[in-house]
Curated annotation (Swiss-Prot):
This is Ethylene receptor 3. It is a multi-pass membrane protein. Belongs to the ethylene receptor family. It is an enzyme of class 2 (transferase). GO terms for cellular component: endoplasmic reticulum; endoplasmic reticulum membrane. GO terms for molecular function: ATP binding; ethylene binding; ethylene receptor activity; metal ion binding; phosphorelay sensor kinase activity. Cu cation binds at residues 176, 180.
Amino acid sequence: MLLSTWTPGCFQGNKILLRSLITWYYLEFMPKLRPFYFLFYLTLPSCATDSPPISDKSSSIFLPLAQQQQLVHWMMPPRFRCQDYLLPLLLALSPAAAAAREVEYHHCHCDGGGGGGGGGLWSMDSIFRWQKVSDLLIAAAYFSIPLEILYFVAGLRHLLPFRWVLVQFGAFIVLCGLTHLLTAFTYEPHPFMVVLLLTTAKFLTALVSFLTAITLLTLIPQLLRVKVRESLLWLKARELDREVVLMKRQEEASWHVRMLTHEIRKSLDRHTVLYTTLIELSRVLGLTNCAVWMPAAGEMCLTHELRRDGGGEDGVVGVDDADVVEVRGSDGVKLLGPDSVLAAASGGKEEGTGAVAAIRMPMLKVSDFKGGTPEVIQTSYAVLVLVPPAGKSWGRHEMEIVEVVAGQVAVALSHATLLEESRAMRDRLAEQNRELLQARRDALMANEARQAFQGVMSQGMRRPIHSILGLVSMVQEEALAPEQRLVVDTMARTATVVSTLVNDVMEMSADSRERFPLETRPFHLHAMIRDAACVARCLCDFRGFGFAVHVENALPDLVVGDERRIFHVLLHMVGNLIGRTEPGHVTLRVRAADDDVLDDRLGQRWDPWWPSYSTGYSSVKFVIGVKRQQNGDAGSPLSRRPSGKGIDLRLSFSMCRKLVQMMQGNIWAILDPQGLPESMTLVLRFQLQSPLTSSSLGGSFEQKHSSPSCQIAGLKVLLIDDDDDINLVVARKLLEKLGCVVSSPPSGSGFLSSVGSSAAAFQLVMVNLEMKRVKALDVATRISQYRSGRWPIVMAMASDQKAWEKCAQSGINGILKKPVILQELKDELARILQST
């Protein structure tokens, strides 16, 4: 039908339909060029403007209405083939078609002749003018479109593979613009050249149009692939968008976790940590309530809650509850059911609340942070319950936030517990330190009291005893009767024992392991027994006891041992026997004992501890017994343990036995049926001393004293002591007894300066190390500065033999231990003079 109506007269009317068909094709398969085609379509001229009107009525530019309807229906795409779209289009075109049919185009201006008819808006002149203006505007628009396409191509270099299509489009648009420009000159009389140019332009336009259409047919598969690629890229973009959303959520969750961790770790108090956790979780997650349940004695107790409503719940849930067991047995977040007791107790049953979540929090112990092998300790778990508002669902990132926060809270609680225990330990250490300081102050006070006691003992007992010993030693040098000498020797030995006891008390200290030091030297055993018997007889006579002594003739005389300690033990045995019984008769028996007897009593073989500078040893047995007058039968031997009646006896006997054991001996007692000591036995082993070496080892009390040697006689001695009591007088008498010329420096403020200058005139300077107002070591050091050659010789007097180390550093030549006895003084002076 379209071909049957295709006449030269209607060519101009049907050309717009062909253009519409081409435009629809491009717009359907090239949607990205729709803006350009839309603009191109708007600028298309109507069929009446492409050529001058034709006067032939049969060659009208409009087709019949039925043919136009069929052509439009065929041209439209399938989705537009509907009567609903076609009817409004025909109604819009019907007025113009009716007006065009009524007008007769009998005026033709091609040659300048013809007349026109009609008037008003629809006159031929007006229509021609409008067509001319429209053609000029269309030409201007067509000429500008290629410039825009070139600018577009310059900005999108990646579209260069389609440059030929763009060039064809540009040529097509330029030719269309040229056609409209030439058409504008055909509304007035014009030469044949204009018609020829117009025909050529239209032919070229048609040719370029068909070439462009053919080129587009080859590009359609590529455009389809681009469409598929666009779909894939769109799907990829959606996936990337989802990943970006997830990343943003993860970043937001990480930020919330960091913020919560920072807030939780601000404090090291357990309660502050828990309340901070509840507040921050509620703020970040928008929760209605939060609660913490702590384990205690087989149940879970509600200890911390964000919102306290004061309800009827008692805040206690059993640890055997199903939800509690499940939550404490899993690592992640668990959503509680609607009938959960734990959720109801945490406020999850109230109106406006959603699904309740819970998670466990491990309560770490302090032992988990200590080194070494970890102990197997059952981990305790607390429960954190989260109550959201109604309609809120738990997302994955929110659960991750809760899990991370629960772990951080567990670590913060463990740190808080560790800090609390550290503070408690610090408080305990501070209390112990205060106790130690108090004990130190008490010890210092006790030491001061002990020193004060020692000072009193030294002033009240030791110094008088030393004076007595010095005087007795002088009396011993006189010509005495045998009975007088016995008494004097006994007094000297007794005073020596008392001095030893006082020294023991004075030198006793808390860190001293050797409370009873031994001084072994050769002595005469017979003389010691005689003196002990003399003192025992005096004690027995004083208490109303009889006394007898039996000494074996084969008993060795010159032995090595500590005669003062042995004398002390014998007197102690006599005192114990006569102090707790009725008056009777005391017997002292001394004999040599076999080694087997001593071995049987000791239960071990004898290991001699003395230096072996003799040929043998001898055991001596001392037996002291008492016989009461009421019964004559002696009791059988009983246990060596003393009775429980006398505490002093037990203490004295234990100390005495310890002293005997130090001398490698043994002592035991035999008690009567009443528990009183009936006899006491002392067994000691002595090293035998040959008479040839007795003089080199110090002699004894019975040694004959020769007259002062020529070196000691006439020796100028300076005696330095700031005390003017009897000790200074006794020391002077002893030196004068030896034939020395004794002088003493004046006391006063210039004592130290006068001593240094005056000491050079003396041969011997004796310094008392126990001076109160002056330091004896400073005096000795000052004297050594004025020494010329070997004179003066400096000798110190001290009660402590250990002071020799300090004296040697101060230039002191020798030390004389107090009490000063005449024979010991003579021996020490002879040794010093011989060595210098």
